[in-house]
A protein has these predicted regions:
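Short secondary-structure boundary segments
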Residues: 40, 119-121, 150-151
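Small/aliphatic-rich secondary-structure junction motif
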Residues: 2-61, 88-93, 165-166
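A short acidic, glycine-rich active-site loop
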Residues: 58-74
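Structural beta-alpha unit
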Residues: 1-4, 78-116, 153-166
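Glycine-rich, Arg-bearing micro-motifs that act as flexible, cationic patches
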Residues: 115-137, 155-159
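Short, flexible loop segments at boundaries between secondary-structure elements
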Residues: 144-156
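Short, solvent-exposed amphipathic alpha-helices that sit
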Residues: 24, 70-79, 103
Length: 166
């Protein structure tokens, strides 16, 4: 017998690729009558740098990580709007200054999540191929079920590449 989900945790970076992930997490939370926890990982960034980079054009230095707290706030606000419109009960929106996988894993444990919903964005950089992408790390280390949402267009997730120092 399958157990019901009581707390669904979803990661967002505010990108268009995150919309189907948040939408699916909200749908599951609504169907399961579960709480929804929205998590956004961010890296240190100045207010000036945040202001110069539109959320839709962000190419974070780490896949899935938003550059700065202000951009992360916009990302979780957008995700919450999507979730509420879908009928989900949002228990918390979290801004976590950490690696995206670690942010999801620790937030899920802290909020007693029994399902993590994450998007499948692949990091094509050398480091990404050696270390694995965020979804791979979460799937390997999660204490609960993990649902990986594929992009609607299969090529979309391949086009994400972190900035280089060049």
């Amino acid at each position: 017998m399958l157990k019901d989900y009581t707390t669904v945790v979803v990661g967002t970076d505010g990108s268009e690729l995150a919309v189907p992930t948040v939408t699916r997490a909200a749908w599951i939370a609504t169907k399961e009558d579960a709480d929804l926890v929205i998590v956004c990982a961010y890296g240190g960034g100045s207010r000036r740098a945040d202001a110069k980079v539109p959320l839709t054009e962000t190419a974070p230095s780490r896949i899935g990580q938003v550059p700065g707290k202000e951009a992360a706030t916009l990302a979780v606000t957008h995700a919450k709007d999507i979730a509420v419109a879908a009928g989900a009960r949002v228990k918390a929106t979290l801004l976590v200054e950490a690696d995206p996988a670690e942010a999801l894993l620790s937030s899920s444990k802290q909020h007693l999540g029994d399902l993590i919903v994450i998007g499948a964005i692949r990091d094509r950089s050398i480091a990404g191929r050696l270390l694995g992408d965020v979804a791979s790390v979460v799937v390997k280390r999660a204490h609960c079920d993990v649902l990986v949402i594929r992009p609607v267009n299969p090529d979309e997730g391949d086009q994400i590449c972190p900035e280089s120092d060049a």
